[in-house]
Swiss-Prot record:
Reported function: Responsible for the transport of dicarboxylates such as succinate, fumarate, and malate from the periplasm across the membrane.
Gene3D superfamilies in UniProt: Sodium:dicarboxylate symporter
Lineage top rank: taxon: Bacteria
HAMAP family to which the protein is assigned, alphabetical: C4_dicarb_transport
Subcellular location: Cell inner membrane
Membrane topology, as annotated: Multi-pass membrane protein
Family: Belongs to the dicarboxylate/amino acid:cation symporter (DAACS) (TC 2.A.23) family.
Membrane-spanning parts: 8-28, 44-64, 77-97, 148-168, 188-208, 222-242, 307-327, 355-375
Gene Ontology MF, one: malate:proton symporter activity
Keywords, sorted A to Z: Cell inner membrane, Cell membrane, Membrane, Symport, Transmembrane, Transmembrane helix, Transport
Name listed for the protein in its UniProt record: C4-dicarboxylate transport protein 1
Swiss-Prot/TrEMBL GO biological process terms: L-aspartate transmembrane transport
One Gene Ontology term, aspect cellular component: plasma membrane
Amino acid sequence: MRKPFYKILYVQVLFAIFVGILLGHYWPDTGVAMKPLGDAFIKLIKMIIGPIIFCTVVSGIAGMRDMKKVGRVGGKALLYFEIVSTFALLLGLIATHALKPGVGFNIDPATLDTKSIAQYVSKAHGQSTVEFFMHIIPDTIFSAFANGDILQILMVSMFFGSALAVVGERARIIHDMVDQVSKVFFHIVHVITKVAPIGAFGAMAFTIGKYGLGSLIPLLKLIGTFYLTAIVFVLVVLGTVARLTGFSIIRFVAYIKEELLIVLGTSSSEAALPHLMEKMEKLGCSKSVVGLVVPTGYSFNLDGTNIYMTMAVIFIAQATNIELTLMQQLTILAVAMVTSKGASGVTGSGFITLAATLAVVPTIPVAGMVLILGIDRFMSECRALTNIVGNGVATVVVSAWEHELDRARLTRVLRGEDEASSLADASAR
């Protein structure tokens, strides 16, 4: 029996976003006061992300038993991430040159007030490759969870899962316990998700109330260029990848619509991480691949952030009349490839990453970030949406490469023919 439409989660979230926009526009002070609702929902999700990743990764690796397979899956995922990330960076660069959203501003960087971006610049710094990998290693096992650092939690989880796999049957009781604890945490996720419309309402009301729809007008061309480029990336680049793997990107996007609407309302792709992992298993991807690819992708496969990085840098150069040589642009691509790996799915992290990129590329003034500060929140939503679609597609692709994709179930679920049975199968797995 179908649910009444008003009880469907994505309908509730969509309605909440609409009401939030109206409240923020007509009563901006009240809209700004709704910020705690959005923040509370994000904190609830972040509270559960660490345990979810730990249990899923540990269970997946321990279930593999073969350490060569763990390395193979991780290697294939990283290879895919780097290839697709490069396409995203290049597409952002090409689109900005083609549509020229920054041409005509004629801004003198010396006249820009940098006080508003000081908090972002202070958090950003150029990070070498060695520093990046050293950061992945936590000071203690517990500090990884206390700080909520996805990469550090992933590191701890991989060591723990590998140890269980090596010990074998003697550790079976621990493996089974982790599986059971995982079910408890996913149940908590389902409970938290019920308040997603409230979180989306609060976050959207705050965004519109603080920044206002009027702040979009001067930079509509940049926003339009970014959204158009992201759509082209999803339909053409990810669409081609999906077609080669044997599924439709349109059907896939429709399949994760609830997660996308939660992300749209909160501007954070982390808000949908637990649900995305569950949906990928339901779709026919193996639990072990989902456990490795999805959490890793949240730091290494941020397609929307990559598009934004090169687009924002070139926009600032155009707006301040700075001519960049081919070598300088290639340097920007290389730097962005590294700095984007430090971004997470949290609201505002893309702007901090942009500051880190500009700090390493002195040709373009960091002060130019002031030009896009007012619209960054509106672009953050598109970044997060593109990121989550990219990570979902990556999971299906790596599962297919590992021959651990149930293609029959994939087809049935995307066509909406196997909702109940596939959910039961996923739970059994």
